[in-house]
Curated annotation (Swiss-Prot):
Keywords: Cell junction, Cell membrane, Gap junction, Glycoprotein, Ion channel, Ion transport, Membrane, Transmembrane, Transmembrane helix, Transport. This is Innexin-12. It is a multi-pass membrane protein. Disruption phenotype: RNAi-mediated knockdown causes defective oocyte transit through the spermatheca. Calcium oscillations triggered during ovulation are random resulting in uncoordinated spermatheca constrictions. Oocytes enter the spermatheca normally but change direction several times before returning into the gonad or proceeding into the uterus. RNAi-mediated knockdown disrupts tail tip morphogenesis resulting in retention of the pointed larval tail tip in adult males (also known as the Lep phenotype). Its main location: membrane. Glycans are attached at residue 99. InterPro entries: Innexin (IPR000990). GO terms for molecular function: gap junction channel activity; gap junction hemi-channel activity. It is found in: Cell membrane; Cell junction, Gap junction. It comes from Caenorhabditis elegans. Belongs to the pannexin family. The lineage of its organism: Eukaryota, Metazoa, Ecdysozoa, Nematoda, Chromadorea.
Length: 408
């Protein structure tokens, strides 16, 4: 139980992504872990399989057959088929080797032993993208989780909050700011574009999308179904009142056959078994299939949305502009200054981190961070078009420059 608690705490939501990220790596992972733990517990505590044995099966013989039928695959024979009715004498059915082999291959049930492991594997696949994302932004030198948590902690003392905001603002803008100063002093045109963090985030989004689509392939192969839309088909059958005896969907009653060597002779045996575990497997996997459908839609939409957000400076400017206009209303008459602030002073990573802070902490810390960075920008970067006037008479310029006109 402690292992499960530690695992669930490890996948708890962190403020380094949006709501869809948390649906993928947190909600889905926790649900799969709980389902895997439940099936595992039922396999040990309950009776995942029970078989009907003839009267001459005694003690260890019945135990051996029961264990064998659980670890080996069983096969389903619909009671509604004519062959099943003619073959109610199972010894006669087993004697017909060719028909039995074909029947086993067609209706083989081989997933119930592996359900806990498959669910655990699915949980790891859903958590893997966020591990890559956190590894990459750590390598880029921007601990996004710590930044967002620090913004949450600034809601206390006013003086302490201002100091923390100043530190965060300097931290997330220092790389682009230093590159901008180098450009102005030395004339170098090449500088780091500061997009490592957002590129890593988009890569995580792509991994989430690939993973959720791969889940349909994984379930199809594991359950041995013919269609990727099996979840809808099972739901339709249940809604229409067609239960597993007719459809074969997660059958509760299957056949198991095995061989026993007695001296030089090999005796074949066939028994009928009840897969109680399939009663739970049906509910779990049908619910999982519908959840994956929902997750696919929201993940595709969310991934497209974030790629659009990272598409260019104009999108970033539309995000920054309302904040800057509230801080400095004069910028409404000087769009060039705002453009320079967004395109040269703020890196794509800085704008992205501000978006995450807004998503996880609200607008208040974002306003304070942008106010501090706007102050740094005005201090470090000279105004555009600030050359001396060309014509002067009696110490006064005959033609005011563009910057002077914009400040009037």
């Amino acid at each position: 139980m402690n292992v499960i608690q530690n695992l669930l705490s490890a996948v708890s939501p962190q403020p380094d992504g949006d709501f869809v990220d948390k649906l993928n790596y947190c909600a889905t992972t926790i649900g799969l872990v709980l389902a895997s733990a439940f099936i595992t517990g039922w396999s040990f505590v309950g009776s995942p399989i029970d078989c009907w044995f003839p009267a001459y099966y005694k003690g260890w013989w019945a135990e051996y057959a029961l264990d064998y039928c659980y670890v080996q695959n069983t096969f389903f024979v619909p009671f509604s088929e004519d062959k099943a009715e003619r073959s109610y004498n199972w010894e006669q059915l087993v004697a017909d080797k060719q028909n039995t082999t074909s029947l086993k291959q067609t209706n083989q049930i081989g997933y119930y032993q592996w359900v806990p492991f498959i669910l655990a594997l699915q949980a790891m696949l859903f958590y893997f993208p966020v591990v890559i994302w956190r590894l990459f932004y750590g390598m880029a030198g921007q601990n996004v989780t710590s930044l967002c948590n620090t913004c949450t902690a600034t809601e206390g003392n006013e003086e302490s909050r201002k100091g923390t905001i100043t530190t965060i603002a300097g931290y997330i803008s220092q790389k682009r700011h230093r590159n901008l100063i180098v450009k102005q002093l030395s004339g170098f045109q090449n500088r780091a574009n500061g997009s490592a963090v957002i590129t890593s985030y988009l890569f995580m989004k792509a991994l989430f999308l690939i993973n959720v689509l791969f889940q349909f392939v994984l379930l199809k192969r594991m359950l041995g179904v013919d269609s990727y839309f099996w979840g809808a088909e099972v739901t339709s059958d249940l809604w229409s009142g067609n239960e597993w005896p007719e459809t074969g969907n997660f059958p509760r009653v299957t056949m198991c056959e095995y061989e026993v060597r007695n001296l030089d002779n090999i005796h074949k045996h066939s028994v009928q078994c009840v897969l109680m575990i399939n009663m739970f497997n049906e509910k779990i996997f049908v619910a999982l299939w519908w959840w994956l459908c929902f997750l696919t839609v929201v993940t595709i939409t969310n991934t497209i949305y974030w790629f659009w957000r990272a598409s260019g400076t104009s999108v970033s400017k539309n995000f920054i502009r309302p904040y800057v206009e509230d801080i400095d209303p004069k910028v409404k008459n000087n769009r060039g200054k705002l453009q320079q602030f967004v395109s040269e002073f703020l890196s794509p990573d800085t704008v992205f981190i501000l978006r995450l802070i807004e998503l996880n902490n609200g607008k208040t810390p974002v306003v304070e961070l942008i106010r501090d960075m706007w102050r740094r920008f005005n201090t470090a970067v000279p105004p555009p078009y600030s050359a001396p006037p060309l014509l002067v008479k009696d110490g006064a310029p005959l033609l005011k420059n563009f910057q002077d006109e914009s400040e009037m």
